[in-house]
Curated annotation (Swiss-Prot):
GO terms for molecular function: nicotinate-nucleotide-dimethylbenzimidazole phosphoribosyltransferase activity. NCBIfam families: cobT_DBIPRT, PRK00105.1. InterPro entries: Nict_dMeBzImd_PRibTrfase, Nict_dMeBzImd_PRibTrfase_bact, Nict_dMeBzImd_PRibTrfase_N, Nict_dMeBzImd_PRibTrfase_sf. It comes from Pseudomonas fluorescens (strain ATCC BAA-477 / NRRL B-23932 / Pf-5). Pathway: Nucleoside biosynthesis; alpha-ribazole biosynthesis; alpha-ribazole from 5,6-dimethylbenzimidazole: step 1/2. GO terms for biological process: cobalamin biosynthetic process. The keyword Lipoprotein does not apply. Its EC number is 2.4.2.21. This is Nicotinate-nucleotide--dimethylbenzimidazole phosphoribosyltransferase. Keywords: Cobalamin biosynthesis, Glycosyltransferase, Transferase. The active site is at E317 (proton acceptor). The keyword Iron does not apply.
Length: 351
């Protein structure tokens, strides 16, 4: 791997296995297509996993956390200390994703890339200390190139741990007060969509707060306008450590051959950056849901993504992706365990 490891080739999809899985679907005891989107979902997983009967026995969930300098502009309904406090909640088992991980029997890891809370040393948390959060991107770049590359590598390292653990599906989650502002800014810069269409309430801003948030993003876009066409520099200028880690994780998963289930708005923006950096990663990215943030729909449309769920979620943490895991597991079970017409001695539709 060279220094720009994220540009290295992604693993190829097993097209022969896709054809075999499609053929199996046609022989199952049901009218063709009657299980709707569950059918192509199982076929796609067969191609990603390289086996006729795919499954998700081993699931890896990584939560990446980091604070954001732009919070100084008053863009969040919650104080910055919440990021550090939630790290303890994750490993203590009290967060939504902690509950979901237990129910799904998933491996859950928590990675702290850099918060404003000094001296955090929590058992069960990987503290990387890239900085006390990012810088205020209205005044300059959110992070240095060195910090950005370290954050990308942190995501890659998590994906490599997932691979070593035998994970068949990777979910990345995020925690960082202010990160919907960062994600909205990145999306605006890369998509060229007006800020007013992308800025949303985040953790609960009122209409006045959303309007202020949009103005802050406008100022940041004007400052960093020269880099708009450069996905990597846009990530470093406007992103968060946890967003960069998600980008790195998604790209490394595609290179190692692990299917990714992308969570909500922030994770989808990370997926957008990943696809812009290395388009070959796209087939490895499945999208769990369409969230309540207004910008999410635009990002999903750009990625030509079909989210599995639409439940009005806006929590983050990887929670929406975790909620979609049973759907993937059931799609695999139906594909792998249903009888064929021949096995069940059921007459097929005449050719």
């Amino acid at each position: 791997m060279n220094n720009s490891w994220w540009l290295e080739p992604c693993k190829a999809i097993d097209t022969q296995m896709v054809e075999q899985a499609l053929a199996r679907q046609q022989q199952l005891t049901k009218p063709a297509g009657s299980l709707g989107r569950l059918e192509p979902l199982a076929v796609r997983l067969a191609g990603l996993q390289g086996r006729l009967k795919p499954g998700i026995e081993r699931l890896w969930i990584a939560i990446f956390a980091g604070d954001h300098g732009v919070v100084a502009e008053g863009v969040s309904a919650y104080p910055q200390e919440v990021t550090g406090q939630m790290l303890l909640n994750f490993v203590s088992g009290g967060a939504a994703i902690s509950v979901l991980a237990r129910q799904l029997q998933a491996q859950l890891e928590v990675v702290d890339l850099g918060t404003v809370t000094p001296g955090l040393n929590l058992p069960g948390v990987r503290h990387l200390n890239l900085g006390a959060g990012t810088q205020n991107f209205v005044q300059g770049p959110a992070m240095t190139r060195a910090q950005g590359e370290q954050a990308l590598q942190a995501g890659r390292d998590s994906a490599l741990r997932a691979h070593a653990d035998g994970a068949q599906l990777f979910i990345g989650g995020e925690m960082g007060i202010g990160n919907t502002t960062a994600a909205s800014a990145i999306a605006c810069a890369l998509l060229g969509i007006p800020v007013a269409q992308l800025a949303g309430p985040g953790t609960g801003l009122n209409a006045e707060g959303v309007n202020h948030k949009a103005q802050v993003i406008e100022r940041a876009l004007a400052l960093h306008d020269a880099s708009r066409g450069d996905a990597l520099q846009t990530l470093f200028n406007l992103g968060g450590f946890e967003v960069a880690a998600l980008v790195g994780a998604y790209l490394a998963c595609a290179q190692e051959g692990i299917a990714v289930l992308v969570d909500g708005f922030i994770c989808s923006v990370a997926a957008l950056v990943a696809v812009r950096l290395n388009p070959a990663c796209a087939p490895w990215l499945l999208f769990a849901h369409q969230g309540a943030e207004p910008g999410h729909r635009h990002v999903l449309q750009t990625l030509q993504a079909e989210p599995l769920l639409d439940l009005g979620l806006r929590l983050g943490e990887g929670s929406g992706a975790a909620l979609a895991v049973p759907l993937l597991r059931l799609a695999c079970d139906l594909h792998g365990q249903m009888a064929t017409f021949a096995e069940a001695a059921v007459a097929d539709r005449p050719a």
